[in-house]
Amino acid sequence: MKTILSNQTVDIPENVDINLKGRTVIVKGPRGTLRRDFNHINVELSLLGKKKKRLRVDKWWGNRKELATVRTICSHVQNMIKGVTLGFRYKMRSVYAHFPINVVIQENGSLVEIRNFLGEKYIRRVRMRPGVACSVSQAQKDELILEGNDIELVSNSAALIQQATTVKNKDIRKFLDGIYVSEKGTVQQADE
């Protein structure tokens, strides 16, 4: 069954500017600028209102799969707005039974070196995605903090660190060592 028109709107806060160039969305906010290209999805994007404070996503004559892209684009734009206003912060904790995992941050937070994982001599090096800064927590032992504006780059960097510490050729139910995401949140607290 085809639906004639499906649309959703995203409210834009006061301190955020959104520009549309075709299907490319550029979001400017206090923490920086994010741009995202939606050219691969056949939808209409438009700004509503006198002050252009709402973004509308339209999909004409779509089937069920195509209608789902409307909400997907809205979610992506909301994440971009949240990123340029509050920023994203992921916290990761080192877990080890015997050999303490030693994490060193190099190159101003863009390179993570993991040493002594399961007592191995091999040094694992993980490069952060562009725009993501990594630091060692001062308040909590064995904790890493990843911060950035783009949720996809921050979460992808966390995944790269977690995958670097996968245990090979052992029973993973017993060998639980690794660096895992413990908390997901924002850099600045939202004013409720």
UniProtKB/Swiss-Prot annotation:
InterPro entries reported in the protein's UniProt record: Ribosomal_uL6-like (IPR000702), Ribosomal_uL6-like_a/b-dom_sf (IPR036789), Ribosomal_uL6_a/b-dom (IPR020040), Ribosomal_uL6_CS2 (IPR002359)
Annotated Gene Ontology cellular component terms: cytosolic large ribosomal subunit
Gene3D superfamilies linked: Ribosomal protein L6, alpha-beta domain
Subcellular localization, as worded in the UniProt entry: Cytoplasm
A GO molecular-function descriptor: rRNA binding
Pfam families to which the protein is assigned, alphabetical: Ribosomal_L6
Keyword annotations: Acetylation, Cytoplasm, Ribonucleoprotein, Ribosomal protein
GO biological process terms held by the UniProt record: cytoplasmic translation
Domain of life where this protein originates: Eukaryota
Keyword Cell membrane found: no
Modified residues annotated as N6-acetyllysine in this record: 121
Family recorded in the similarity comment: Belongs to the universal ribosomal protein uL6 family.
Known partners and oligomeric status: Component of the large ribosomal subunit.
Annotated function: Component of the large ribosomal subunit. The ribosome is a large ribonucleoprotein complex responsible for the synthesis of proteins in the cell.
Stated name of the protein: Large ribosomal subunit protein uL6
Name of the gene encoding the protein in the UniProt record: RPL9
